[in-house]
Amino acid sequence: MFDLGSQGVIMSHDNDWNKVRLELDKSDNFGAIYNSPWYTDAVYDKFSDEEFARRHAAARKLMARDGLDALILTGGPDIYSHGSGVTWGAGLIDDRGMCQYMILPLKGEPTLIYPHYGCHIEAARKQVSVRDVRSGQHGKYGKAVGERLIELGMQKARIGITAADRTGPEFMGVNAYLDMQKLLPQATFVFCPEMLHELTYLKGPEEIRAMAKAGQIAIKALQAVAATARPGMREYQLAAAVAPAVMNEGGRYHLLMIGSTSMHDPRIIFPNPNPSHRVLREGDIILSELAMSYMGYSAKIGHPVTIGKPTEKYNTFFKEVVVPGFEEVRGQLKPGNTLEAVRKTGSRVFRDRGAQSRPTIMHGLDLITSVPFVRADRIRAEPYETTMQPGMTYNIELTPVDKEGIFGIFFSRSFAITENGALDLTPFPVDEILVAG
């Protein structure tokens, strides 16, 4: 008989595969099954146990500071979340459910609530670095979370909830929240919109390595666009070309924004969030924002591609406005420098060259896009991150636009601050427009 429980897997149910394996056609047996031999030969690239222990210890330190007895880490599959706290806390990378949940008590074993059951949850157990993985009870996530909190004696506790979605922000499903309140009427639930950012704005070596891998994958995505683009194709086919390039490297695409227009009659300054059915033609320019992730951590690149030689107008704009402006902003990335210095530089570099730009200059990277947001006219940042420190990660995101507001070029690279400067996470040449083919 198999006994995976002896390998350190914690289960709270009694549907041991060894007991029910002869009656798998009974739904009650299959729904909460565990300890099967299924997927035991699956291999995943994971962060080390020491890295997850570091993360959990850091979270518990903030919990103690804020008087929290437990923390519910949340995350979802949408692009404003990309797994968020659940990916960070457990290593889960999965698209099931509007929101997913992990319980981290101040003292005790963390628990992941997984949306699906049966074979799905057994596969998830091999992917994640949390030993206690339980079913979401067919969408009754709040009930599953609440029952675990009761096991932990949290009936009168202060329980934090991280933001699943950085916009809003949004925290969890309404029904899940109501079910938790019903099960724990004397508990106090506290929304913690910035806690995950406080835990992720400084990266460790393993996280930086994952982001560097994501950067290499982003470069491959850009190269796939350039290799595929030709007259007669449609924009969405460029997006289709990115998918195998990224997935062949074990990555995932987070942002896949691609737009095209004629260099002789330009109609875009920024990539299309929804690549269209537009047919590519000779003399087109392709703008893309390609954010790819590896082990949940992302890096982004944006670089223009033309079908045929770039026109003199675009080539001059790129070499005399885009590239030198980017180099000036990049020169500000160093430990001890301030976000305000970046803002001042970014706000003038294109005006000085007779152009203008979208407001965005740079943003932070937690696992994905995050604060701080540095714009030409304002900064949104937490007090502890206004000065750059080693381990902080950023994406320079520039869109220089001509003074009439008609044409522009999106340009982007990702960086990690080091002891001596900045590590380029997307090391791709910047000096020339990329010509397709």
Q: Can you annotate each of these PLM segments?
A:
Residues 1-437:
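Active-site neighborhoods and metal-handling regions in enzymes and metal-associated proteins
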